[in-house]
A protein has these predicted regions:
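Cytoplasmic helix-loop-helix junction between adjacent transmembrane helices
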Residues: 115-154
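Residue-level signature of mid-helix packing/kink "hotspots" within the transmembrane helices
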Residues: 38, 65-74, 124, 158-159, ...
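Symmetry-related core transmembrane helices of the 12-TM Major Facilitator Superfamily/SLC fold
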Residues: 175-193, 417-436
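Structural signature of the two symmetry-related core transmembrane helices
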Residues: 87-101, 321-338
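Cytosolic juxtamembrane N-terminal segment immediately preceding the first transmembrane helix
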Residues: 1-35, 49
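Extracytoplasmic gate region of multi-pass secondary transporters
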Residues: 40-41, 248-304, 364, 368, ...
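Conserved MFS/SLC helix-loop-helix module at the cytosolic interface between two early adjacent transmembrane helices
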Residues: 71-110
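Helix-breaking motifs and short loop linkers at transmembrane-helix boundaries and internal kinks
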Residues: 52, 84, 105-110, 122, ...
Length: 460
């Protein structure tokens, strides 16, 4: 008996360390899968010349990628309760690596646009899984930081794409895809040898004290909600989950806000280098790469620092104190965002972009955390899949193409019009976040009243 306890403890510790290793692998996958975006956006002229594209067709690279994500998110949401998390993630990573090699097989623009759609399709299983896994297993006080880390890894991936193009040369922009494919194959191997248990989303209920258990049983609303979950668990499917989520006001407002924040961020990264080269007229590629590298690190890292500074104030995204600071972050991000289109030099454009990304990167993890945590744990993966579908349809899939169309039509007269139009959409998120803050505070007030009633019953 004495020997069994230390062995059990060692097993728990190994489990925790291995879960941390799994988080590192998954977060790095999120980053590496975005290297392709950096490779394409840093060599816009060379890609368009090599594949004989105009701005609108180049923008379809981003659009096709998003529509691949839409299809994948839909399938993942529908099959979420039936498929293995391990194998959906592993196969997604493996096939993503294989499809990257297609850029070395053909120069046909239409074929490669379709391949970019396949990239988006295979990217979604790990992209959906990681945030839900963090919300399930991470220490509560560090959830926002870990979600920010995942977001930071995505930006670093784009930065690595710029650096690879600088190393190999813009005319050899395809070579970076080999580096990306190689690392993803290594990650595929790591996932293959990992036990299914480490991908499990089984819900764990912490042991309650006698007093907490008594309060829980007295609270009728909580008890009835738990009973309803048990009765409906076997009847759940994608469409029933969709019906429940569509009636959830906090969830829908979170999705609308995330669509805007994530979509504008995606479009900015996709077209920023082209904006610097063709609107600011910065022709020094080394200078553009250096500035973009600074943007990639300073923006999200600044957002992470801002979240750390705000932590004593907002505690976590589950706290009611996070609501109104989130609105202020978004207003500030919107102001800096629209100012990017009016900048005249590379330096001022870089500074405005960094300021925008700092506040955007601070707000996005909080919105994403609220989105996942405001619904039942069983609905987390489906809810995030639906959020991804709507994000790709409404913003991430349309804004790169919209930028290209506006740029093709008006770049001779108003070269900065496309950037101004896209970044002005950032203000649309403000009223959604105001409504979200109001409804969250109202919900917390109701929960406090129910808690007080429960305590009164316990005293009696």
């Amino acid at each position: 008996m004495e020997d069994s306890k230390p062995k059990e403890l060692r097993k728990v510790r190994l489990s925790r360390y291995y879960r941390f290793f799994l988080f590192f692998i998954m977060a790095s996958i999120e980053g590496v899968m975005n290297i392709a975006n950096g490779l394409l956006s840093s060599a816009t002229k060379e890609v368009k010349k090599s594949l004989n594209m105009n701005d609108a067709k180049f923008g379809s690279f981003g659009t096709s990628n998003s529509f691949g994500r839409i299809i994948s998110s839909t399938l993942f949401g529908m099959l979420n309760q039936k498929i293995s998390r391990k194998w959906s993630t592993t196969l997604g990573i493996g096939f993503h690596a294989i499809f990257l090699l297609c850029f070395h097989i053909t120069d046909n623009a239409n074929v490669l646009i379709f391949v970019r759609g396949l990239h988006g399709f295979t990217q979604m299983p790990p992209s959906i899984y990681v945030p839900v896994w963090i919300d399930q297993y991470a220490i509560r006080s560090y959830r926002t930081v870990q979600l920010t880390t995942v977001q930071l890894s995505q930006t670093i991936g784009k930065c690595i794409g710029y650096l690879l193009n600088m190393y190999f040369g813009l005319e050899h922009w395809k070579k970076g895809f080999l580096v990306e494919a190689g690392y993803l194959l290594f990650c595929t191997f790591c996932c293959l040898i990992t036990s299914e248990d480490y991908f499990s989303m089984t819900l764990y209920r912490p042991k309650l004290s006698d007093e907490e258990e008594k309060k829980l049983r007295i609270s009728c609303t909580i008890y009835e909600e738990q009973e309803r979950k048990v009765e409906n668990k076997k009847k759940r499917n994608f469409f029933s989950d969709l019906k429940i989520l569509s009636c959830h006001s906090l969830y829908m407002l979170s999705v609308a806000s995330r669509c805007i924040l994530h979509g504008i961020n995606t479009c900015l990264h996709f077209w920023l280098a082209d904006f610097m080269r063709n609107v600011i007229h910065e022709q020094n590629q080394l200078k553009i790469t250096i500035y973009y590298t600074i943007i990639c690190f300073a923006g999200p890292v600044g957002g992470m620092i801002a979240n750390t500074v705000l932590k004593p104030i907002i505690h976590s995204y589950e706290s009611r104190k996070a609501s109104w600071p989130l609105v202020l972050l978004q207003i500030t991000a919107s102001i800096f965002g629209i100012s990017i289109g009016f900048m005249k030099t590379t330096l001022t454009t870089t500074l405005a972009t960094i300021c925008f990304l700092i506040f955007n990167s601070s707000a996005l993890p909080i919105v994403q955390g609220i989105l996942i945590s405001c619904v039942d744990k069983e609905l987390g993966a489906t809810g995030f899949a639906i959020a991804n579908i709507l994000t790709q349809v409404l913003t991430s899939g349309t804004t790169p193409l919209l930028y290209g169309i506006i740029n093709d039509k008006y770049k001779e007269i108003y070269p900065n019009l496309a950037m101004i139009c896209i970044m002005s959409l950032e203000f649309v998120a403000v009223p959604f976040l105001c409504a979200l803050a109001y409804l969250r505070n109202k919900k917390f007030d109701e929960e406090e009243k129910n808690k007080d009633k429960g305590e009164e019953l316990v005293d009696k």
